[in-house]
Amino acid sequence: MSHVPGKLGAEYYRSFLNRQGRDCYDHILEQLNKKDYSGVSSSVAIRDISSAASDCFAAYKAVRDDHPEFFFLGFQSEFTRIGHKGILRYPILYSEDIIERVQYQVRKSVCQLVRGTAGLPVIEREILVYERIAKKLSYNNHGDVRDHNIVGPVLYNDGVCEGYNALLMLCFRRIGIPCVKVYGKTKTDGWHCWTVAWINGEPVHCDVTWDSPDEEAGIVWFNYLNLSAKQISVNHYEFSGKEVPACVSERFNYHRYKGLSVNSTAELIDRMEQDLTASAQSLLHLNYCPKQNDPMSEVKSAFKKSRLFGSISIHTCADLNNVLIVRKL
């Protein structure tokens, strides 16, 4: 499924439910939109008794995955059946008063993060918001539910991948970019989640958690913005399946879109001399295309051969052959 989802992706996982699951999904959604925080969806019509429980559990998970604005929903749910009526119970993590207070802060935070994007092309809107979120948040796992929903990122400026993802999805949808949550694994963190967004109709992978600035450089890398499935699979895996859009385009990848790819040492020297001058910027993002060469060694060699003076610090993303060069003036 790679077509652009309706409602900016807000009912994406609903589309994979069977009829009974969709009925339960709609029932839960109607209650939550009416600010019913009882944590009980009663009188759910049962069409197929044999799959009633699993369908309702799937519906609840789909609601949570589709709607990061429902940050107050807990993880587990409980289903009971009386005849052809089902009752789904789920935990509400906060009181109604706290929910309303957090909702106000969420609206305020999202407005701040998307400010100034209205007149920009879609991809420039995306880049600006992505960078702001990456700079705003720090990765911290406090062992609390706030790390996994919007509360940690909005109130404390930190969280884990689910928190990062929730804020990114809310902001993307606010600026008109369809997006959905994707689950998978990584080589370093085990289970992980990130975003698939549709840029000009094409689905791409975005992992803002992995683009958090490192403490040394303090600069957003954009390594994981708008990747194809092939590109992100160098260190993300077990994310393929019928529910995950087929992301094949690489033309919106940050480095390609910005014209930051170099194919030889000569090109590398030219780009460094052109962009790392005293009168221009002091940092340079590059994708070094020759896979057989070590980017770190190539940059060091190119700097020595160039007409630049001073010193540089070099940061590499070996998996994607990306280089961040910071010139110390």
Task: Identify the residue ranges that each predicted region occupies.
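Alpha-helix capping and helix-loop boundary segments enriched in small/acidic/polar residues
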Residues: I28, L155-G159, Y183-T186
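Extracytoplasmic/secreted proteins, especially bacterial periplasmic and envelope-associated proteins
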Residues: D55-A58, A62, R101, Q105-K108, ...
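Short, well-ordered strand-loop elements centered on a beta-strand within folded domains, enriched
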Residues: L88-R89, G152-Y156, E202-V208
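Secondary-structure boundary elements
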Residues: E96-P153
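Structured core of small recognition/catalytic domains
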Residues: V160, L168, I312-T316
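Hydrophobic/aromatic-rich core segments of domains that either
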Residues: G163-Q231
